[in-house]
């Protein structure tokens, strides 16, 4: 927990119990790409008494401080993930809503080439690919979007 205390201090935020609890939940492997509402439900399941308004406020503070990255996927709901992860892009299934993270060196290099062709030096980028399940089997099937090769 002291690492989280230091992370909050390094980000210029006061260490409070709600911030610590929210950060702990965000660090759980099953809490990547989590909405404020789902994070709130997770906190309730853990017996934490943190209001939904506080969850929204803390997530906005974390976003401003660079602790989390906010994504606006199809459907209008914001989801959050810790910013400490390596760069990756996202593939979103419009049928089931699953968000798949991927990295591809060829795509990364091509984006740099395109920017250079327009005399722009990239500082950051986001790539979101949207699609539908190839065979319609994804709803209720946790293995539907496993990488095939």
From Swiss-Prot:
Chain spans, region DNA-binding: 1-84
GO annotation (BP), single: negative regulation of siderophore biosynthetic process
GO MF terms held by the record: DNA-binding transcription activator activity; DNA-binding transcription repressor activity; sequence-specific DNA binding; transcription cis-regulatory region binding; zinc ion binding
This protein's GO CC annotations: cytosol; protein-DNA complex
UniProtKB keywords: Cytoplasm, DNA-binding, Iron, Metal-binding, Repressor, Transcription, Transcription regulation, Zinc
InterPro entries, per database record: FUR, Fur_C, WH-like_DNA-bd_sf, WH_DNA-bd_sf
One Pfam family cited in the UniProt record for this chain: FUR
Subcellular location field: Cytoplasm
Chain sites annotated for binding Fe cation: 87, 89, 108, 125
Positions that bind Zn(2+): 33, 81, 90, 93, 96, 101
Domain of life: Bacteria
Family: Belongs to the Fur family.
Subunit structure: Homodimer.
NCBIfam families: PRK09462.1
General function of this protein: Fur acts as a repressor, employing Fe(2+) as a cofactor to bind the operator of the iron transport operon.
Protein's UniProt name: Ferric uptake regulation protein
Gene transcribed to yield this protein: fur
